[in-house]
């Protein structure tokens, strides 16, 4: 399962092996995490300040530097949270012009994880997935559920069985399938990894 993209590919942090654009998060050979390796020369001529400023008021204005296929930006306006001047903190640390990004107002679920999920689900659509899943203790679950519902993708969320209901209320509101697993987050995450299909299957 692959799609062509000249701007980036996945590369293993440890062994250096490259995997093109596949739905992988870890190297199948050495199990090290994968990172996105960009061909900056491929975007240098087309990615300008003017083009950024003319783009939509969300993360998709930076699409040329996001690991998503061209033309696959969802219409959900994620990101573009405000910068707030932090005068008091700036005075304490000697920075007169200090601004802090306020991600407490990130659309749609008030979490910085909305940006990551938007990019992940854009790729899920490009690969043709009809169901996405994650392990979570709250914010990631809500973001995956909300954005999957918007895109018409099924979502299956694995959480620790003793997680407080308030943390995943929105997950249920958005219609995700919730699976409670006995154990802590690490155990839940391992369950997700073991049950996820391999792209080589």
Specify the residue positions occupied by each region the protein language model found:
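PLP-dependent amino-acid enzyme catalytic core
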Residues: 1-196, 200
């Amino acid at each position: 399962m692959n799609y062509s993209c000249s701007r980036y590919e996945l590369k293993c942090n440890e062994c250096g092996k490259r995997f093109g654009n596949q739905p992988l998060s870890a190297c199948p050979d050495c199990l090290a995490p994968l990172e996105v390796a960009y061909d900056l020369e491929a975007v240098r001529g087309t990615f300008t300040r003017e083009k950024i400023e003319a783009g939509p008021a969300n993360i998709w204005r930076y699409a040329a530097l996001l690991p998503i296929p061209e033309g696959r930006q969802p219409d959900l306006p994620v990101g573009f949270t405000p910068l707030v001047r932090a005068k008091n903190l700036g005075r304490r640390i000697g920075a007169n012009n200090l601004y802090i990004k306020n991600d407490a107002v990130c659309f749609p679920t008030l979490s910085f994880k909305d940006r990551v999920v938007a990019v992940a689900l854009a790729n899920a659509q490009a690969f043709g997935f009809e169901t996405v899943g994650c392990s979570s203790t709250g914010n990631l679950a809500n973001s995956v559920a909300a954005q999957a519902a918007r895109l018409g993708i099924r979502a299956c969320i694995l959480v620790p069985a003793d997680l407080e209901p308030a943390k995943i209320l929105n997950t249920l509101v958005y219609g995700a399938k919730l699976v409670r697993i006995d154990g802590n987050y690490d155990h839940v995450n391992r369950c997700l990894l073991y049950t996820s299909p391999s792209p080589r299957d």
